[in-house]
């Protein structure tokens, strides 16, 4: 590469400045003489430290080039494997793609839970700021705030119709909200500590809650009365989720176990213990994924001829585990997150698993091959929650960075 006379002159002056400022006096005077440099104070200021600056900026640019090259390779790969640019993927295989469609700000403390409405194009977020916010995920517009709790809200579920929203809080209460009038219609007291999780049973008549008081309680929606208490966990119960038909509920705890309970008898049907730290989250596999799971894990079809049910769990041991509840066996362990796993669920197509964690990422797993197939650097801080829309191609995440992000899938 040939330098112009001006560039050569600038380079020589920068070299001279470098030699002099680093104490190479002899080399400086020889170089100055040979390069026929006329150094004066004004010029000296202009070239002070220039060589080092150029050197570091070259390194920075090289790093940027490498980053862009890897993004380009990723895009090429997506193109050849039929990404959004290549032939159209089957919607069952659509996964979230960066960058996010919307980053929504409004909460004044970490976001603890995000969920989609089952019918309308809205989603709801809960936060440590004791509020629930409603957003339109198609336009990114903020719609309203629901206030009533006096401490951090830990969990929010809708019933299947979307007319009823439940919430639970560190203020030890559970609230039911009429999602048409946006009013709190009932407050339930009964737990002796932080209520960390709540879920509405599929029939809509009862709700279940889990607490730091080590119990799980079942409540009647109509009256607000506690009708059952499930005891057995030895520590804080982090999450509770009913299965599709409401005959079983699963729970996970700081005691490092996942338990499955028979609702009718309150008996603990299975205690799943292989995690090595607090189990933060659980999720039931939808029946649409049963055949893929059986194929991927070679799990035996039982005498009844029906596989499953299957359950996912995510833990502070940084792993995700898949369980066959009927046998109590751990079918697989997915390793890849670099910090506590905070949310896990099945892709609505049944072939993939999505998870979020304190390593600030959202990950998509191809469980058939037990590998992480996509990692999205989702937030500036821990990712606390995620939800996948049942019918529309959207994923939503919430974070300690106080934002809610909407990701489009394709």
Swiss-Prot record:
Q: Does the keyword RNA-binding apply?
A: no
Query: One Pfam family name from the record?
Result: LisH_PAC1
Q: Identify the stretch(es) annotated as Required for self-association and interaction with PAFAH1B2 and PAFAH1B3.
A: 1-38
Keywords from the UniProt entry: Acetylation, Cell cycle, Cell division, Coiled coil, Cytoplasm, Cytoskeleton, Developmental protein, Differentiation, Lipid degradation, Lipid metabolism, Membrane, Microtubule, Mitosis, Neurogenesis, Nucleus, Phosphoprotein, Repeat, Transport, WD repeat
- Assign the protein's first listed, main location to one coarse class: cytoplasm
| Annotated spans, Interaction with NDE1 | 1-66
Would the keyword Oxidoreductase be found if you checked this record's keyword annotation?
A: no
Q: Return the annotated region ranges for Interaction with NDEL1.
A: 1-102, 388-410
Residues bearing the modification Phosphoserine: 109
The biological processes this protein is annotated with in GO are: cell differentiation; cell division; endoplasmic reticulum to Golgi vesicle-mediated transport; establishment of mitotic spindle orientation; intra-Golgi vesicle-mediated transport; intracellular protein transport; lipid catabolic process; microtubule sliding
Stretches for region Interaction with DCX: 367-409
Report what the protein is called. Answer: Platelet-activating factor acetylhydrolase IB subunit alpha
User: Which source organism does the UniProt entry give?
Assistant: Pongo abelii
Lineage runs: Eukaryota, Metazoa, Chordata, Craniata, Vertebrata
């Amino acid at each position: 590469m040939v330098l112009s006379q001006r560039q050569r002159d600038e380079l020589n002056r920068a070299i001279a400045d470098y030699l002099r400022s680093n104490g190479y006096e002899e080399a400086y005077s020889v170089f100055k003489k040979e390069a026929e440099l006329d150094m004066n104070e004004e010029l000296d200021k202009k070239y002070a430290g220039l060589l080092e600056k150029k050197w570091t900026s070259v390194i920075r640019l090289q790093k940027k080039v490498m980053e862009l090259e890897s993004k380009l390779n990723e895009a090429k790969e997506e193109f050849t494997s039929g990404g959004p640019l290549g032939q159209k993927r089957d919607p069952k295989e659509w996964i979230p793609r960066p960058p996010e469609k919307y980053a929504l700000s409004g909460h004044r403390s970490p976001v603890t839970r995000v969920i989609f409405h089952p019918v309308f194009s809205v989603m709801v977020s809960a936060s440590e700021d004791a509020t629930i916010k409603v957003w339109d995920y198609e336009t990114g517009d903020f719609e309203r705030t629901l206030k009533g709790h006096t401490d951090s809200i830990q969990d929010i579920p809708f019933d299947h119709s979307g007319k009823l929203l439940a919430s639970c809080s560190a203020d030890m209460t559970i609230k039911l909200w009429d999602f048409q009038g946006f009013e709190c219609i009932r407050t339930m007291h009964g737990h002796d500590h932080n209520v960390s999780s709540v879920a509405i049973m599929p029939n809509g008549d009862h709700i279940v809650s889990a607490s730091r008081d080590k119990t799980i309680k079942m409540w009647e929606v109509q009256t607000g009365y506690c009708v059952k208490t499930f005891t057995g966990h030895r520590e804080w119960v982090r999450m509770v989720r009913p299965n599709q038909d409401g005959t079983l509920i699963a729970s996970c705890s700081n005691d490092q176990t996942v338990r499955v309970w028979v609702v009718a008898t309150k008996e603990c049907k299975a205690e799943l213990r292989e995690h090595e730290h607090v189990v933060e989250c659980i999720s039931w596999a939808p029946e649409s994924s049963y055949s893929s799971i059986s194929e991927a894990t070679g799990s035996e079809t039982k005498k009844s001829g029906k596989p499953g049910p299957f359950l996912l769990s995510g833990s502070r041991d940084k792993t995700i585990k898949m369980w066959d509840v009927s046998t109590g066996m751990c079918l697989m362990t997915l390793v890849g997150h670099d910090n506590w796993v905070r949310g896990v669920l099945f892709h609505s197509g049944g072939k993939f698993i999505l998870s979020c964690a304190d390593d600030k990422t959202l990950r998509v797993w191809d469980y058939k091959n037990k590998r992480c197939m996509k990692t999205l650097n989702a937030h500036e801080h821990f990712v606390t929650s995620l939800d996948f829309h049942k019918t529309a191609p959207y994923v939503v995440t919430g974070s300690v960075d106080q934002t809610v992000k909407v990701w489009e899938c394709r």
